[in-house]
């Protein structure tokens, strides 16, 4: 009896705890809502301004309903103005212009075409009029839908074609039953014009948000982010002690993440920037497509940074004692690349051409020093130079194997196989011991591993026997185990140097791709009419920037 009471009390406690958890969990989420709302506005204060602009626009357009004189003039069709404000008013001025003009042109063309259809079908009978309207709806609908597949129309006027189809069908089909269809089209056009006018006023004149400026800032931020990623990657690779892994977001990944994910954002911002009027003091045309090209080149450059980051996460790593031999030229080479990226970011940010000495002699000196450092350690990358001794030992082991095989030919088939296997193992051990002695005599000694060839040969022989037994039993499916990381390292004499060779080659590839980035940025400055580089005014700023390029913060505009 006591056991039953005890079990019942436990179940009751579990039920109460679950109920308490179900009650407290929503309350905890509700408490986090104000903080999340605050963070949304803190990340980009322009979001708060946009929300206030939308609220004010809806209030103004609602006056068409609230004020009696305006309502009498427009009537119930004023709801189209409210719908226009909700649909058209976007975050940036370019997006609002794109949607507003598309909606206005679509409505105007659809109304004109519907009026023409009504004028032609007015004199025909009721049946012929229905057939004519149905045929017109079919042809116009099919043609407009097919036009939407054209890439240029899809990119720039897709929303306008949708509004055209909607307005044309509403007016044309309703004209068969309603006589005052022209008045309906007239009222709808005016209400949509009022809504679009309010949206354009709010977007262009009240704290305007330009897509071109957002594209400009994101390009600067991507250059700065790549610079920080490269610097952090090289610093972490040459750290003396291994860094403990944390759950926080990787600082290296944060730098190049925006570059890899920027394709759709750049194209959208460039599309909206193409609709925006010239609003700068010089009134130059905004080179939106050139910004897209710069973004594409930066993504190609970013892939190299991703591969460089991958060198830090490989399973087989070069010992830190070996990395230290090449630390100085690699750090200087990466520093020069970071300086160049920071200079490009500053030139775009300040609307000026970059320095003519952006690729300084220090970069070429760092490349030459890295090349000399690698050449100074040939045994590290090419293995031992004493190939003649290896050949002698190999020839001796092969001759010994043949001699033992001839002597043991009369011992039987199985015994002959075992003796030849043992001789092969003995010869292989001699080669391994000779290679280890040569590694000790080299300039740089790597941590050596002893290849257990006998175990490998025994494994192969047992694998054949087990495979034959399983095939006899009818079980033919078997997964062959793969070699471990140690087996891979023992199979290559210079396997420890391969990760660093990949790291160094990626640094050199980064320098090669830097030329493409500089060319596109210079082309951007030429098209956008950037001001010329002033050596006297910018010399001090360049010296300060080049010392610590990683402290520059990214300012990326929001885009919708």
From Swiss-Prot:
This protein's source sits in the domain of life called Eukaryota
Q: What induces it?
A: Not induced by aluminum.
Q: What is its main location?
A: membrane
Q: Among the record's GO biological process terms, what is one?
A: malate transport
Question: Region labeled Disordered — which residues?
Answer: 386-421
Q: What happens when the gene is disrupted?
A: Impaired stomatal closure resulting in a wilty phenotype.
On tissue specificity, the annotation reads:
Expressed in roots, stems, leaves, flowers and pollen. Mainly detected in the roots vascular stele and in the leaves guard cells.
Disulfide bond positions? none
Spell out the subcellular localization from the entry: Cell membrane
Q: What residues form the membrane-spanning segments?
A: 54-74, 78-98, 104-124, 130-150, 156-176, 189-209
- Cellular component per GO, a single term: plasma membrane
Q: Its family?
A: Belongs to the aromatic acid exporter (TC 2.A.85) family.
Q: What does this protein do?
A: Malate-sensitive anion transporter permeable to chloride, nitrate, sulfate and malate. Involved in dark-, CO(2)-, abscisic acid- and water-deficient-induced stomatal closure. Belongs to the R-type anion channels.
* Name of the protein in its database record: Aluminum-activated malate transporter 12
């Amino acid at each position: 009896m006591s056991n039953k009471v005890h079990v019942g009390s436990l179940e009751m406690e579990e039920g109460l705890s679950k109920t308490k958890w179900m009650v407290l969990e929503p309350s905890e989420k509700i408490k986090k809502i104000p903080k999340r709302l605050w963070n949304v506005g803190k990340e980009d204060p322009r979001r708060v301004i946009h929300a206030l602009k939308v609220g004010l626009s809806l209030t103004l357009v609602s006056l068409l309903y609230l004020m009696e004189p305006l309502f009498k003039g427009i009537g119930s069709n004023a709801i189209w103005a409210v719908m226009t404000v909700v649909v058209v008013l976007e975050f940036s001025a370019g997006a609002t212009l794109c949607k507003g003009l598309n909606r206005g042109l679509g409505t105007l063309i659809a109304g004109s075409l519907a009026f023409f259809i009504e004028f032609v079908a007015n004199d025909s009978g009721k049946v012929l009029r229905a057939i004519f309207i149905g045929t017109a709806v079919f042809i116009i609908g099919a043609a407009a839908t097919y036009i939407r597949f054209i890439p240029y129309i899809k990119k720039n006027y897709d929303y306008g074609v949708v509004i055209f189809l909607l307005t044309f069908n509403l007016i044309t089909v309703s004209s068969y039953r309603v006589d005052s269809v022209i008045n309906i089209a007239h009222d709808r056009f005016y209400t949509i014009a009022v809504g679009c006018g309010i949206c354009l006023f709010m977007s262009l004149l009240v704290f305007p948000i330009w897509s071109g400026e957002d594209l400009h800032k994101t390009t600067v931020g991507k250059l700065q982010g790549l610079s920080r990623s490269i610097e952090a990657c090289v610093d972490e690779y040459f750290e003396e002690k291994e860094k403990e892994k944390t759950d926080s977001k990787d600082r290296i990944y944060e730098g190049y993440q925006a570059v890899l994910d920027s394709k759709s954002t750049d194209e959208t911002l460039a599309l909206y920037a193409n609709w925006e009027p010239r609003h700068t003091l010089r009134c130059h045309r905004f080179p939106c497509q050139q910004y897209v090209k710069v973004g594409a080149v930066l993504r190609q450059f970013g892939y190299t940074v991703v591969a460089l980051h991958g060198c830090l996460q490989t399973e087989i790593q070069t010992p830190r004692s070996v990395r230290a031999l090449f630390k100085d030229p690699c750090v200087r080479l990466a520093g020069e690349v970071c300086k160049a990226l920071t200079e490009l970011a500053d030139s775009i940010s300040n609307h000026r051409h970059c320095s003519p000495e952006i690729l300084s002699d220090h970069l070429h000196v760092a490349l030459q020093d890295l090349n000399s450092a690698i050449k100074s350690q040939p045994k590290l990358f090419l293995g031992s130079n004493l190939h003649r001794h290896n050949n002698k030992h190999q020839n001796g082991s092969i001759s010994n194997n043949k001699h033992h095989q001839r002597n043991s030919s009369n011992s039987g088939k199985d015994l002959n196989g075992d003796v030849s296997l043992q001789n092969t193992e003995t010869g292989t051990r001699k080669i391994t011991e000779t290679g280890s002695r040569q590694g000790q005599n080299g300039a740089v000694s790597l941590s050596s591993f002893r290849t257990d060839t006998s175990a490998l040969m025994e494994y192969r022989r047992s694998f054949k026997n087990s495979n034959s037994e399983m095939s006899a039993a009818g079980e033919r499916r078997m997964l062959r185990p793969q070699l471990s990381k140690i087996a891979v390292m023992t199979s290559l004499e210079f396997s420890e140097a391969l990760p660093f060779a990949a790291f160094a080659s990626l640094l050199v590839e980064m320098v090669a791709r830097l030329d493409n980035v500089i060319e596109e940025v210079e082309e951007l400055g030429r098209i956008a009419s950037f001001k010329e580089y002033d050596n006297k005014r910018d010399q001090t700023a360049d010296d300060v920037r080049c010392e610590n390029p990683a402290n520059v913060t990214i300012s990326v505009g929001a885009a919708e």
